[in-house]
């Protein structure tokens, strides 16, 4: 049976993972600047294997509006181009023989609002994940044997403090991303 400290540590660890997942989701949202992270979820069919794009090529940003993808094997050039074209990012790769250039167009106001809306959805998903972890932790607190009513209440209050802290972190990360998108 777990004790209060291990429940709190486990809850913090799981909530950290929820925040990391949230940040990963946000990293693929396009902002006004070129960011190699937007290609993170692209998978390339490389000699029959599905591989993340960053494992078959280097991705650089020579300027704020351009991504340059340089495959480590020229045979990967066309599959990379196809994977980018087929993705839902709406990018148009330009194959230059040994590298692929992607020019990122300016974001329209409408597109920025859509991106903020997506970010809000990711933030809400993260908040829900944190709250679900709180519920699980509260259930665990109630299962600890040998605790009096006051100790259970104190444990529940501690779990709530942890939850509030992580919900605030979600909000902070979201607001930062929102400024990045709208800015």
From Swiss-Prot:
Q: Which UniProt keywords apply?
A: Cytoplasm, Protein biosynthesis
Q: Which GO terms describe its cellular component?
A: cytoplasm
Q: Which CDD domains match?
A: RRF
Give the GO biological process terms. translation; translational termination
HAMAP family per UniProt: RRF
Described purpose of this protein according to its UniProt entry? Responsible for the release of ribosomes from messenger RNA at the termination of protein biosynthesis. May increase the efficiency of translation by recycling ribosomes from one round of translation to another.
Name the PANTHER family on file.
MITOCHONDRIAL RIBOSOME RECYCLING FACTOR PSEUDO 1, RIBOSOME RECYCLING FACTOR
Q: What protein am I looking at?
A: Ribosome-recycling factor
* Species of the source: Deinococcus radiodurans (strain ATCC 13939 / DSM 20539 / JCM 16871 / CCUG 27074 / LMG 4051 / NBRC 15346 / NCIMB 9279 / VKM B-1422 / R1)
